[in-house]
Every structure is written in C-alpha cells, then in structure tokens.
Amino acid sequence: MIELQQLCRSFQIGDQCVHALDHIDLHIERGEYLSVMGPSGSGKSTLLNMLGLLDTPSGGEYRLNQTATSQLNEEARATLRREHIGFVFQSYHLIPRLTARENIELPLILAGIAPKQRKPIIDRVITRLALTDRAAHVPSQLSGGQRQRVAIGRAIVMKPELLLADEPTGNLDSVSGREVIELLEELNDEGITLLVVTHDQAIGVRAKRELKMIDGRIASDSARPAITPQLAP
Amino acid sequence: MRIADLLAFNLKLIERQRLRSAMLLAAIAISVMAINLLTGIGEGGKQFVLGEFNLLGKNVLIMLPGKKETTGGIPPLTGETTRDLTLRDAQAIARLANVSAVAPLIAGKMEISHHKLSREAFTIGSNRAFFAIRQLEVAQGKALPLLPFEQGQAVCVIGSKLRKELFGPKPALGQWLRAGDSRFRVIGILKDKGEGLGFDMNEAIIVPVANAQALFNQAGLFRVFIELRSLDGLQQSQQRILALLKERHEGEEDVTIITQDSLLSAFENILNTLTLAVAGIAGISMLVAGILIMNVSLIAVSQRTREIGLLKALGCPARTVALIFLSEASIMALSGALLGILISELLLATARGLYPTIPFTTPFWAQLGSALIATVTALLFAAIPARKAANMAPVDALLDKKAGQA
C-alpha cells in the first residue's frame, strides 16, 4: 500500500542543510500496525507528515496505492488525504468553537456530503467512540481523553485506509492514554493501517512492527532484522 | 462544500466567537458610520448655504446703487458721482411691463424701545411686496399695509425674537414701540425663520419705507428688489431696467443688477471648495476606515492559521479554504456596512430634529461608496492572508510556523 523509495526531506536552517529524512526506503502493507520511535529530531514526525501528504519530499518517491505522489499538485494531494488518510495529533487540533459532534462532522461537510447521509455516519462513529452524552459539548468542556477520542472520530469518519497518529498519548495521563491506544488498536483490528509516532517505549512495543529512527534514517525495523554478519557454521 | 454548510459554518463562527465578530462588525460599522456622518454634515452645510440663496426666487433681481466693475481692467480713477437710488426710480421701474412687484429697501441699526426695555435692532424700511419677495410669513397680525411709496404710516412688523425680548410673555400686537424719535404700532409678528442672506429676520423690525427714510434721515435706497412676471426675457428686462435708470440718471449707468444666477456663480468658488471639503472628509474617513478594517481582518485570519492547517489536513482544497474565509468576510462586511448606515441615518435624523434649518442628509454616493469600501477592504484583507495560509504547506500551517520561528 505504501512504498517509499529513497525519500529525502531537507531543511535549510541558517547556512546548514539538515536532512530530516535521509534516503528512506519503506514498504507498508495494508492493515499493518507500526510504531515509529526515536529521539527528538530523528525525523519521525517528518516521516509521518510525509506519509500523510502534509509535506512534500525534496527527493525520492512516495507511492500511495500505486499512485506516485511527488508529481501531484496540492489539490490532488488534498483529495488523496481526504479519501485515504486520517490524522490524530498530539494537541488534538479540534476547532474550539465547534461541538464534539460538529468536529467529527467537519470532514464530511468539507467533502460535500448531504446532511441526510451525514447523520447516520456520525451517529455510528459517536456510538462507536462512546461519546453520545458528550456530543453537544465543545472541546473546552471535555477531558483530554475525550478530546482525543473526538479527534479519532474525526480521523475515521471518512473511513480512511491509513490512520496516522503523532504522539496521540503525549498530552494524556496514563489511563486515558491506554484507552486511546486501545481504541486505535481496535480500529487496526478492523482493518485500518495504523502508524503511531511515539516517545513512549511502552506504547511503541505494542505495535506489531517497530521502526526506530536516528538522524533521518531508519535504524532498525523489526520486520526486517538487521543483517548482522554471522559466523559460518 | 455545500453552500448551506458553508453558511452554517460561517454563522457558527460568528455566533460562537462573539467578541471577535463584534470587534470586526464594530470596526466596519464605525467606519461606514463615520463616512456617512461626515459627508452628511458636510452636505447639510452645503445645502444650507445653497438654500439661503434659493430664498430669493429665480425671477427676483436685486438692484444696488453704484456700478460694480466686474470685467477687470483699470478701475476708474476719477471720483464717481454716485447718485442715490430714489423712491421715484423704484416707482418708474414698477411701471415697466414685465415687472410685477418692486420692494425698495432701506436698512440700518436703530435703538428700539418699549417702556423701559430697549434694544438695538436691525431696522428695515420697505413695503408690502417685500414680504412676498423675501418669503416672509406673518405669524400674528398682518403685514405692512399697501401704501404709495412716499406715504408713511406709524406701523411696524417685528421678528419673533425681538418680540420676546421687548414684550416677554405679554401680547405685543397693538402696542407702541419707540424707534429713534418716532413711534410705531406693532401690527404683525413674523413667523420664526432662520437667517437669510445675513439678516436675522427674527431680530428685525420692518416699517414703511417712507418712515425709514425719515428715521435714518436719508433719501437714497439701500437696494431695490424687483420681481419679474416671468423668467422669459430676464435678460431683456434687465436691459430695460438699466436703460431706464440710465435715462433717469442723466445718461450714466450707475446701478448694478444682481440676479440669483449671478449671485450663485459669484459664490460658485465657495460652493466648489465646500464640495471639495466634503469629498476630502469622505476620502480621509474612508482611508481610516479601510485601515481599521484591514487590521481587524488581518488579526482575525492570522489567528486562524492552525485552523487553516487542519482544514487542509482534512483534505480541504485551497480554493475551499479561501471560499470559507471570503464568504465569512463578506457576511461581516455587508452586515457591518448595513449597521453603520442605519446608525448614521438615525443620528442624522436626530440632528435634523435638533437643527431643523440644516438639511443633514448623506448623499447616496457616500452610502454606496462607504459600503463598497468597507466590503472591498474587508474582503481584500481577509483574502490576502487567507490565500497565503491556504497556499502554505499543510504541515507549516498546522504548526503555525510563522509564530513558531519568531
């Protein structure tokens, strides 16, 4: 489903060129559950933004469902995001003036879906996330865990194939953090491809496939054990 | 995005961010109001001045003694023998074919007293025709009687303010006033009316012209108002009057005739300056309004860069993002402009109530212009930052990179 070939992303900071992503090759199958770990500045968020088409590569190619994305314009990338990708951010990024229900509804509205068709979809998502009695509340009236559930609801309401979560538990206490990660894992069990960027070792190891990043490179990938020189038997 | 959803989204924004919306609405409304009020007051002043000139009918000529050279050139160095304009001259004019009425005028300040109260008042000597020509109405009693020019009568008509000052609450009709060494019986009181051509008729006393000649001990007339039967042949009538006076004054043309048109054209410079001043005031207030709206719009949009980032992450095309912000700005601008016009109309109506003589009205061009300028600036300065944010990489907008790097 996802194919990265020699993907690069560099930033000019002052007169220094920083390689946030340094020739990355990565292959992700549909339905996989990955965690990306690594120290700050190792490029894990840049990788997530790249996979989410929020950022454009400086070099290399990214294929999403066999579509080469590097040549696409912003409009086409927006359409791909809308139809295939859901985002969960550390700071939720909910619109403060909209209620929980309206925040979840937003992607459907932007996609131009008729109100009649929207209603059953949102109802299902709200029930699924156990937010029924909080649906009419604005984010400031919700707890952190509830806010992140609303954000997850918004991410999955368009039924994307890929769910990208950037430190989804970073602002949460351990109990709500675990609830959120369990919710994401349930969604993965239902078939969604899940990629979680995290600092938290305990969360990282729950993934079926763990990536470790250092200095813009994938230092280890549990699916492809490092080829260490082995002594001949 | 569907139109209904777009509207709902914007209305929610306006409804749930009341402070921000109120600020933007107030900025636009105040700007539009300022433009409308200022031009309304300026226009009111201009119309007031114009109205003053229109007090004289178009078919009324004013004759002054002496020749005013308006053609330039070297002024006559020899001393001019200015003959007086006499009542006989006025009588001769009254006999001309196209002349319907003639009002001779002598005017000056005179001490007027009643019992112990006394006051210096503007004293006018004229006749019955003067009332019609100057459009003076009598509130109580009657106007001066119809008399031959040379015949006096000890009666007077006084302005409402003079009446109040001399008689207070007591009735004035039939009472006697002293002016100089003559006495006059009050036979009429003028209706309250503002100033006209510099005379405050509310403070004036009008007596028959023959009496005024005696009072001021002066035979010469200050001026003569001539009312023509019709406007056709205005030029010819003017020529005939001048010819008549030349004949009567031993071949010398020593009077000047002023028409309303010539008076207006003489004041054209002043009126043009007034119009320019009004336009200048409008221009400056539009500029200030534009900058005010610009700032509030800029703040409103830059506060929402993260929201734009989110919309883009959710797959909203740049075009839709721009549409959301533009439609919101138009709703705000239009309702703000409407509110501003409404408030300014209300205030001007109040001002008209307080000062009925000055016609405070905002010209249509100012209303349209202010609404247009408000809408265009609000749209422009919502569009520029919204466009910029919409064209940012989604990741930069989400993190609001501008703020982050600062």
Regions found by a protein language model. Give the residues of each.
Chain A
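ABC-family P-loop ATPase nucleotide-binding domain
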Residues: 1-10, 220-233
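H-loop (His-switch) and adjacent beta-strand-loop-beta switch element
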Residues: 210-223
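ABC family nucleotide-binding domain
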Residues: 1-213
